[in-house]
Curated annotation (Swiss-Prot):
CheB-type methylesterase domain mapped to chain residues: 184-377
Described function: Involved in chemotaxis. Part of a chemotaxis signal transduction system that modulates chemotaxis in response to various stimuli. Catalyzes the demethylation of specific methylglutamate residues introduced into the chemoreceptors (methyl-accepting chemotaxis proteins or MCP) by CheR. Also mediates the irreversible deamidation of specific glutamine residues to glutamic acid.
Active site: S196, H223, D319
CDD domains the record matches: CheB_Rec (cd16432), REC_CheB-like (cd17541)
Catalysed transformations (reactions): [protein]-L-glutamate 5-O-methyl ester + H2O = L-glutamyl-[protein] + methanol + H(+); L-glutaminyl-[protein] + H2O = L-glutamyl-[protein] + NH4(+)
Keywords assigned: Chemotaxis, Cytoplasm, Hydrolase, Phosphoprotein
Modification after translation (UniProt): Phosphorylated by CheA. Phosphorylation of the N-terminal regulatory domain activates the methylesterase activity.
Keyword Phosphoprotein: yes
Lineage: Bacteria, Pseudomonadati, Pseudomonadota, Gammaproteobacteria, Vibrionales
The species this protein was found in: Vibrio cholerae serotype O1 (strain ATCC 39315 / El Tor Inaba N16961)
Other comment: In V.cholerae cheB2 is a pseudogene.
Coiled-coil ranges (or none): none
Protein name from the UniProt record: Protein-glutamate methylesterase/protein-glutamine glutaminase 1
Amino acid sequence: MAIKVLVVDDSSFFRRRVSEIINSESRLEVIDVAVNGKEAVEKAARLKPDVITMDIEMPVMDGISAVREIMANNPVPILMFSSLTHDGAKATLDALDAGALDFLPKKFEDIARNRDEAVTLLQQRVLSIASKKMFLRRPAAPRPAPTTSIAASSSLSQERAAATSPLGNRPSTAVSAATRFKASGKKYQLTAIGTSTGGPVALQKILTKLPVNYPHPIVLIQHMPATFTAAFASRLNSLCKIEVKEAEDGDMLRPGVAYLAPGGKQMMLDGRPGAARLRIIDGGDRMNYKPCVDVTFGSAAKIFGDKVLSMILTGMGADGREGARMLKQAGATIWAQDEESCVVYGMPQAVAKAGISTEDLPLERIAERMLVEVGLA
């Protein structure tokens, strides 16, 4: 039986185009369309689609409000379409907060090399989230603007500053059932995390649980368009105790700071342990992903060797496998997110099947495991 899809967009051209692409895949069938969020909510309840594709900017009711309504009453996997603008990025992140599982730029040809690849990309994204009802969440409360209040920003800044002071009070790092995990005893100088589909929510779950005194730098590689990463880094920074920033060329790595690879570029490490810096380069057109997990992991292996704690989280494809292989050859630690907690079990499966990862962990316990491993729990 074909996967039933509801297409939601106020543009008749885009509804027709998306419907044609979806219907050209035999496993998918567009059962209806909706022209605004209110109509989408009604048809989601009545038609019970397996997947919804949803525009963000629509009359009557916008896509974010529609996602919240649908998740509260008739949860279904939702793929968002958004514009490649800063405001579009922020709105997309709001939609993911509300419960949408994945997103694509509305001009999805912009992240594909040709039309055939663009068609396949959309079809694969719909197929990948179709069976993921277990990941559907109750909607988050509407996010006020600005994301973080001045008082909250001040509080976070003071806490971060205290952590770098010899007199700073160490915050509580207690985690539930930490005794189930045992630290390996290895010493680390870098944490590296790579992810794709489902990554924004996964990274938020992990990073918000890390204390301000996390002992070494963190590099994050999330497949994301160029205009999205700054907004994503800003959002994470407003929610986390650690500092999170979009990486810039020449950044010196500092403990307790997470550096998010900028979209459309490659992030590499240069220098030596204790004095390492980031290099942000174009990387050429031969790479399938920009940023690419393999590129960052490979450079981390050369600089930090066995002093890297690395993780591959939910994502489509196999990016990260070869970089993780280089890390393993250097003696580093590689973990993978387990299948049950992945939105798409592609990237973690690739490292697990290759025998590269040493532990497969549920998303809810990765931060706990990290804290045990680095000696903070």
